[in-house]
C-alpha cells in the first residue's frame, strides 16, 4: 500500500491526489477543497445503493440455482418464465417511448462507420486508434490477406509491383461502385480536375465525364486544374483520392493517383475496462493520464521501428476547398468515447468508511468526466465533441435498476463538475442477460442521455452460461454462435433500439471481429452486421477499420434501419432458450478438444495479464491463429469449463493435466518475448498458472462468472512478488 492523503471522509492515494490536483483541477473552474469534499459526499451517498445492487445480483443467482436444481429433468418453459417474472428477473415493460437525447455529434447520430476499442494503458495504440479516423486503403489492401498472394502477388520484404497493380485495380473497382462516373470507369481516368465547381475526369481517349451523382464531390486540395486531393462523399463517409505523379505509386498510375484514403473509425472507445489491467492507484493514474493527454491533444508515444526512432502524436484536422470556393474542415481524429468500469469492482486508489476501497465505477465517472470537461471549456488543442457532450460507455449492467443507478451517478457528477444536465451521454453495453431481456426498460432509464447500445457476444455468452449454471451442461463454445438465444439477442437489440427512436440519433453497435490477421474473411463476413441494422461495429485495428469502412459504402445503413423499423417482434421467449445439452453425446476426443482450446486460450491471455499487466493482446490459439483476447473472451472460456466440471463432463484431474500441457504450448508461443516468464515446469510457483486454475476451478462461485476479482487479486500478488525479487 502506498501513501495516502486524508481529505474529509476519504483517503486518497497520493499518486492520484497529486495527479488530480496538479494536472486535472487547474483551469477546470473547480475549487480544489470543494472538489474533494463533493467527491467524498458522492462516495458516501452512492456506495450503499451500489452495494444493494450487487447483493441483488447474488440473491437472484441463488434463486436461479435453486430453481434449476429443483426442476432438473422436468423443465417447463412456462413455469420458468413465470418464476423469472416472480423474482423480478423479467420486468413489466414500460409503455412505448422515444429517446430525447440532444447535442449528439454527427459521428454518432448521422454517420455510420467502424468503431475501434483500444486500451488506455498503451499510449501508442490509443494514438493510432484516435488517428484511425482516416486510413490508407492501399496500405490496408497491400499489407493484409485482403489481396491474395496468388499469381506472383506475394507481399515480400520489398515493394512488389504485381501486388501493387492488384491493389490499384481493387481501388478503382471500389470507386466505380461507391462514386461511379456518369460515363466510363475510374480505371479509364488519366486526370482529375475541378472545372466550374464540378469534378471533371479525363479518360485515356481524351473524353471527359463527371460523377454520376455530382453532389458526391465535396472538396479538393491544391490547384483546381491539378488537385493533390479530391474529396468525395458516399453514404455519409468521405473518400479522398490523393494525386502525386512524383510519388513511387503515383508514377505508376496513369492518373497519378498515389492512394485512396478512407474515412474509417469515426468513433473510438478509449477503454479503461475489459482491455486494460488496472488493479491499483498507479495503474489507474496511467489510464487517466493517457486519457487526459488524448483530450488535451499533447499525448505522444516514442518507439523504435525498423531501427528508427518514431514519435506518434495526434493528427490535425483536414482542410479542403469546397466546390463553391469556401473552406471545409473535417476532423483528423476519431470522436472519442471513454469506457468506465461497471458496478462490481473496487480499487484502493481511494478509501472511505472503515478503510473500504471505493467502487471503481464511481471513481471512473468523476475523474474521466473531469478530464473530458477540459475539452468543453477550451483547454485543449482539439475539440473532441463539437456539440459539447461527454461520451461514457457503461458496461456490465444487469437490468434497469442498475442503469437507473448509472443515470443517478451521472446526474451527481454533472452537478459536482458544474456541467449542464445530460452533458454526460451514456453508451449502454447490452452484454448481460437481465439487460437483454429488459432492454426497453434499461433504455427508458437513460432516455435523455443514451447515445449507444451494443451487443457483445462473448460477455453475453459468459453471463448466459453462469446464469443457468445449474440447468445442465452447455453447448461447446463455437456452437453458441448458432444457438437460438444468440440469434434472438442480436435481432432484439436492433429492434428495441429502432423502436426507441435510435435511427438518426444514436448508435446501434455490433461486436468485434477478433481475428486481425484474417482480413479477407472479415471483408466477406462483417458486412452482414450492417444488413442486420447496425450503424457501427467493432474492429481490432486501424487497418481493419479502413477495410471495414468499405462495407458502409456497400450498404446504406439508414435505408436498412428504415426497413427494419417495422420489426415489432418480441424476441424474449427465444432469448430465454437455455443453450443446455440434455443428453450430451460428445466423444472423449471432442471433450478433450474443447478442454485443449479453452485451456490454451485462458493461459495465453492470463499469463500476459498477470505477469506483464497486458489487458488486451493478440493471443495465438491452438492452431496459431492470432485472436484478439480481452476479459470477455476469458469469461466465456473459463465459464464453459466451470460448467462442464460442475456437470461431470470432465474431471478436475483432466482439466489440470490439460492446463499443464497447454502451459508448455503457450510458453513455446511466447519464446520470443524477452519479458515472458514461463509457467512450466514450476506450475505452483507461477502466479499466472494459479490464476488460470482459479478461474476454472472457482468459476462456479465467481459473481456472475466475472473474471476481475481473481485477476485483480493475482495481479496484485504478482506485482508484489516481482517487486520483492528486484529488491
Swiss-Prot record:
Disulfide bonds: none annotated. It catalyses: glyoxylate + acetyl-CoA + H2O = (S)-malate + CoA + H(+). Its EC number is 2.3.3.9. Pfam families: MS_C, MS_N, MS_TIM-barrel, MSG_insertion. GO terms for biological process: glyoxylate catabolic process; glyoxylate cycle; tricarboxylic acid cycle. Its main location: cytoplasm. Coiled coil: none annotated. The active site is at 339 (proton acceptor), 630 (proton donor). Acetyl-CoA binds at residues 117, 124-125, 275, 312, 540. It comes from the Bacteria. Pathway: Carbohydrate metabolism; glyoxylate cycle; (S)-malate from isocitrate: step 2/2. GO terms for cellular component: cytosol. Its cofactor is Mg(2+). It is found in: Cytoplasm. Glyoxylate binds at residues 339, 431, 456-459. The modification Cysteine sulfenic acid (-SOH) is found at residue 616. Mg(2+) binds at residues 431, 459. One of its GO terms (molecular function) is magnesium ion binding. The keyword Transferase applies. Keywords: Cytoplasm, Glyoxylate bypass, Magnesium, Metal-binding, Oxidation, Transferase, Tricarboxylic acid cycle. Belongs to the malate synthase family. GlcB subfamily. NCBIfam families: malate_syn_G, PRK02999.1. Involved in the glycolate utilization. Catalyzes the condensation and subsequent hydrolysis of acetyl-coenzyme A (acetyl-CoA) and glyoxylate to form malate and CoA. Monomer. This is Malate synthase G. It comes from Geobacillus kaustophilus (strain HTA426). The lineage of its organism: Bacteria, Bacillati, Bacillota, Bacilli, Bacillales.
Amino acid at each position: 500500500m502506498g501513501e495516502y492523503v486524508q481529505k474529509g471522509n476519504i483517503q486518497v492515494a497520493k499518486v492520484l491526489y497529486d495527479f488530480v490536483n496538479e494536472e486535472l483541477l487547474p483551469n477546470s473552474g473547480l475549487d480544489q477543497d470543494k472538489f474533494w469534499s463533493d467527491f467524498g459526499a458522492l462516495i458516501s451517498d452512492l456506495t450503499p445503493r451500489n452495494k444493494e445492487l450487487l447483493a441483488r445480483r447474488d440473491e437472484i443467482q441463488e434463486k436461479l440455482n435453486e430453481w434449476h436444481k429443483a426442476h432438473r429433468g422436468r423443465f417447463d418453459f412456462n413455469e420458468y418464465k413465470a418464476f423469472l417474472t416472480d423474482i423480478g428477473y423479467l420486468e413489466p415493460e414500460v409503455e412505448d417511448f422515444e429517446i430525447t437525447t440532444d447535442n449528439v455529434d454527427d459521428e454518432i447520430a448521422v454517420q455510420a462507420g467502424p468503431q475501434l476499442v483500444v486500451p488506455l494503458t498503451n499510449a501508442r495504440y490509443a494514438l493510432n486508434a484516435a488517428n484511425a479516423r482516416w486510413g490508407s486503403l492501399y496500405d490496408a489492401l497491400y499489407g493484409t490477406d485482403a489481396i491474395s498472394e496468388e499469381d506472383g502477388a506475394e507481399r515480400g520484404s520489398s515493394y512488389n509491383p504485381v501486388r501493387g497493380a492488384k491493389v490499384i485495380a481493387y481501388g478503382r473497382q471500389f470507386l466505380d461502385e461507391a462514386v461511379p462516373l456518369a460515363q466510363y470507369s475510374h480505371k479509364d481516368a488519366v486526370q482529375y480536375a475541378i472545372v466550374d465547381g464540378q469534378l471533371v475526369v479525363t479518360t485515356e481517349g481524351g473524353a471527359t465525364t463527371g460523377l454520376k451523382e455530382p453532389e458526391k464531390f465535396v472538396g479538393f486540395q491544391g490547384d483546381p486544374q491539378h488537385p493533390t486531393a479530391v474529396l468525395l462523399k458516399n453514404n455519409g463517409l468521405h473518400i479522398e483520392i490523393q494525386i502525386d505523379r512524383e510519388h513511387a505509386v503515383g508514377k505508376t498510375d496513369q492518373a497519378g493517383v498515389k492512394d485512396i484514403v478512407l474515412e474509417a473509425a469515426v468513433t473510438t472507445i478509449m477503454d479503461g475496462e475489459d482491455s486494460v489491467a488496472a488493479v491499483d492507484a498507479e495503474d489507474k493514474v496511467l489510464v487517466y493520464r493517457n486519457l487526459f493527454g488524448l483530450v488535451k491533444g499533447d499525448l505522444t508515444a516514442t518507439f523504435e521501428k525498423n531501427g528508427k526512432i518514431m514519435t506518434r502524436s495526434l493528427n490535425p484536422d483536414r482542410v479542403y476547398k469546397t466546390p463553391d470556393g469556401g473552406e471545409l474542415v473535417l476532423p483528423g481524429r476519431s470522436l472519442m468515447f471513454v469506457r468506465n468500469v461497471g458496478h462490481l469492482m473496487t480499487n484502493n486508489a481511494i478509501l472511505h468508511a472503515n478503510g473500504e476501497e471505493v467502487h471503481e465505477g464511481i471513481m471512473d465517472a468523476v475523474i474521466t468526466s473531469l478530464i473530458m470537461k477540459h475539452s468543453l471549456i477550451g483547454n485543449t488543442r482539439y475539440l473532441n465533441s463539437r456539440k459539447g457532450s461527454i461520451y461514457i460507455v457503461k458496461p456490465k449492467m444487469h437490468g434497469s435498476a442498475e442503469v437507473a443507478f448509472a443515470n443517478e451517478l451521472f446526474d451527481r457528477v454533472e452537478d459536482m463538475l458544474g456541467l449542464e444536465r445530460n452533458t454526460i451521454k451514456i453508451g449502454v453495453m447490452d452484454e448481460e442477460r437481465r439487460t437483454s431481456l429488459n432492454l426497453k426498460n434499461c433504455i427508458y432509464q437513460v432516455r435523455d442521455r443514451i447515445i449507444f447500445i451494443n451487443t457483445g457476444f462473448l460477455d453475453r455468452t459468459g453471463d448466459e452460461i453462469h446464469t443457468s449454471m445449474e440447468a445442465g451442461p452447455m453447448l461447446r463454445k463455437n456452437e453458441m454462435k448458432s444457438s437460438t438465444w444468440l440469434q434472438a439477442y442480436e435481432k432484439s437489440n436492433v429492434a428495441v433500439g429502432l423502436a426507441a427512436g435510435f435511427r438518426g440519433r444514436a448508435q446501434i453497435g455490433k461486436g468485434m471481429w477478433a481475428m486481425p490477421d484474417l482480413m479477407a474473411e472479415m471483408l466477406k463476413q462483417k458486412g452482414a452486421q450492417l444488413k442486420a441494422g447496425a450503424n457501427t461495429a467493432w474492429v481490432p485495428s486501424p487497418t481493419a477499420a479502413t477495410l471495414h469502412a468499405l462495407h458502409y459504402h456497400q450498404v446504406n445503413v439508414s435505408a436498412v434501419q428504415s426497413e427494419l423499423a417495422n420489426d415489432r417482434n418480441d424476441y424474449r421467449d427465444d432469448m430465454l432458450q437455455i443453450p443446455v445439452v440434455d443428453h450430451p453425446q460428445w466423444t472423449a476426443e471432442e471433450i478433450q478438444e474443447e478442454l485443449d482450446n479453452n485451456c490454451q486460450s485462458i493461459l495465453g491471455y492470463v499469463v500476459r495479464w498477470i505477469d506483464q499487466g497486458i489487458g488486451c493482446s493478440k493471443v495465438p490459439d491452438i492452431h496459431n491463429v492470432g485472436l484478439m483476447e480481452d476479459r470477455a473472451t476469458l469469461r466465456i472460456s473459463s465459464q464453459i469449463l466451470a460448467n462442464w466440471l460442475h456437470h461431470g463432463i470432465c474431471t478436475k484431474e483432466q482439466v489440470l493435466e490439460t492446463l499443464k500441457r497447454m502451459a508448455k504450448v503457450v510458453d513455446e508461443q511466447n519464446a520470443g518475448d524477452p519479458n515472458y516468464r514461463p509457467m512450466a515446469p514450476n506450475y505452483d510457483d507461477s502466479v499466472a498458472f494459479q490464476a488460470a486454475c482459479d478461474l476454472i476451478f472457482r468459476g462456479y462461485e465467481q459473481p456472475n462468472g466475472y473474471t476481475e476479482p481473481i485477476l485483480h487479486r493475482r495481479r496484485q500478488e504478482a506485482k508484489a512478488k516481482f517487486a520483492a525479487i528486484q529488491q
